């Protein structure tokens, strides 16, 4: 991994870009994952590279739903394993959720590489998806495979940085689907039950904080949070945030400004 000086004004952006490249070199991340990361980074620029209120609202609803779930599962793909392996394990622990390796471009080598990366942070962690025996209806080839004891039986599934086709297929199966996607226009964002429009490197640590905070909430409080949540409004509010921010930047000028609000 290329060493980036912390004095660089785009340190964190470059750092995570290198993590994705490293993930590909380790055999975890598919080439298409690099393209997906770049697309997400572009939307992160638009929202201001921070967690905005609609994302916070979505995270609270997502955590409430996961805490009430009987069989919650957090899906892990190559980009997730490259960017937030430790944070993924911490989130699953906080939610008492299972972890399943689930890949669009599935190969046994990629599954093995992701499992090895996750086990660096917890050698005893139970990982599902190593030998999946079930298939999501309507999805052909390797991308449709899921673990019988994981996503197949899950009532609530977290599918971060996910393909829209699979998100939609999981919804058709009757799963409650939560996605983390920086692109509010993507099919995953539009088809999920709860869409967290935020960078996963910010979202997972915050969701872990919320899980620890909300685990003592009453069942009634958690249900109220979910019932009051409107995913359509969340997506609309994200688009309005982007519009208003770009309008403000255009009116105030950006030429030679070192920082953009």
Curated annotation (Swiss-Prot):
Q: What is its EC number?
A: 6.3.2.36
Listed under catalytic activity are: (R)-4-phosphopantoate + beta-alanine + ATP = (R)-4'-phosphopantothenate + AMP + diphosphate + H(+)
Name the InterPro entries for this protein.
PPS/PS, PPS/PS_sf
UniProt keyword annotation of Ribonucleoprotein present:
no
Residues holding ATP: 17, 39, 181-182, 187-188, 199-200
Pathway it belongs to? Cofactor biosynthesis; coenzyme A biosynthesis
Lineage, top-rank taxon, reads: Archaea
Q: Which UniProt keywords apply?
A: ATP-binding, Coenzyme A biosynthesis, Ligase, Nucleotide-binding
User: Looking at the keywords, is Cell cycle present?
Assistant: no
Q: Which residues form the signal peptide?
A: none
One annotated GO biological process: coenzyme A biosynthetic process
Select a single GO molecular function from the record's annotations and give it. ATP binding
Any one Pfam family match given in the protein's UniProt record, by short name = PPS_PS
Role according to the record: Catalyzes the condensation of (R)-4-phosphopantoate and beta-alanine to 4'-phosphopantothenate in the CoA biosynthesis pathway.
Q: Which family does it belong to?
A: Belongs to the archaeal phosphopantothenate synthetase family.
Record-linked PANTHER family:
4-PHOSPHOPANTOATE--BETA-ALANINE LIGASE
Assembly, in brief, is: Homodimer.
Q: What is this protein called?
A: 4-phosphopantoate--beta-alanine ligase
Q: Which organism is it from?
A: Thermococcus onnurineus (strain NA1)
């Amino acid at each position: 991994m290329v060493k980036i000086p912390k004095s660089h004004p785009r340190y964190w952006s470059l750092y995570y870009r290198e993590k994705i490249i490293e993930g590909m070199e380790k055999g975890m991340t598919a080439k298409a994952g690099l393209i997906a990361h770049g697309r997400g980074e572009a939307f992160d620029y638009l929202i201001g590279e921070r967690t905005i209120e609609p994302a916070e609202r979505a995270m609270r609803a997502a955590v409430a739903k996961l805490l009430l779930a009987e069989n919650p599962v957090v899906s892990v793909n190559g980009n997730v394993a490259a960017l937030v392996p430790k944070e993924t394990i911490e989130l699953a622990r906080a939610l008492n959720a299972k972890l399943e390796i689930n890949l669009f471009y599935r190969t046994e080598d990629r599954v093995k590489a992701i499992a090895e990366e996750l086990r660096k942070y917890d050698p005893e962690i139970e990982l599902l998806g190593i030998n999946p025996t079930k298939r999501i209806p309507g999805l052909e080839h390797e991308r449709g495979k899921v673990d019988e004891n994981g996503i197949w039986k899950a009532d609530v599934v977290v599918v971060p940085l996910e393909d829209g086709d699979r998100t939609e297929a999981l919804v058709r199966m009757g799963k409650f689907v939560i996605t983390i996607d920086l692109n509010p226009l993507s099919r995953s964002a539009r088809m999920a039950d709860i869409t967290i429009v935020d960078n996963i490197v910010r979202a997972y640590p915050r969701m872990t904080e919320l899980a620890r905070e909300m685990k003592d909430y009453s069942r009634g409080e958690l249900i109220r949070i979910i019932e009051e949540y409107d995913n359509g409004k969340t997506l609309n509010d994200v688009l309005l945030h982007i519009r208003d921010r770009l309008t403000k930047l255009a009116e105030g000028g950006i030429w030679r400004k070192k920082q953009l609000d």
